[in-house]
Amino acid sequence: MDIRDRILEAAKRVYAQHGFRGATTRLIAIEADVNEVTLFRTFGSKAALFEALMAAHNAQTPIPPLPEESADPVREMTDWVRRVLAHLRENRALIRTSVGEAEERPGAAVTMCEGPTCAGRILSDYMRRLQAQGLADRDVDVDTVRAMLMSAMFGDAICRDMMDRVFPEPESEAAAKYVGIVVRALGIDRARPVHLARSAAGD
């Protein structure tokens, strides 16, 4: 790992623990095992370092795709939710800190949520394709279903360890349980073969 990446990783850990004000360049330099001169030569300022940190976070955010033509909506959504949840849980501390400082540093919170926001658009588009393919009820309000699922995932990832017996158990089955509710909300008939639903939609 080169010096720049090492400093960014250190800044991520220190920021998650101490917030922007508490994440001094001295603490970050110690965590990265470099001196402050090296830190400033690399980034120029603390503000520039944190801009780079947020940009790096977004660049590294895995936003899983959903298929253009669905073969198995339940499996596809369950896999997708599982991957998004894993990313949110992995970055729980960083997200909490950014949201907690939203009043003081709104730009950082918005940047931190760009990945989930993009994921929400991908999910909405997928649900509309399910409607067009005859796999979901055309009258369902997709945006509301998407908002409910994204909110559930965000709350689960950020608050599960603080709110006992509030979220689906066991944790490993949460994705499947959330999707089970979404499937019913969308009016997806699990028992109906996909090719028959598509044929009916084309009539």
PLM features: residue spans?
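Amphipathic alpha-helical interaction segments
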Residues: 6, 48, 79, 97, ...
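C-terminal effector-binding regulatory domain of bacterial HTH transcription factors
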Residues: 186-203
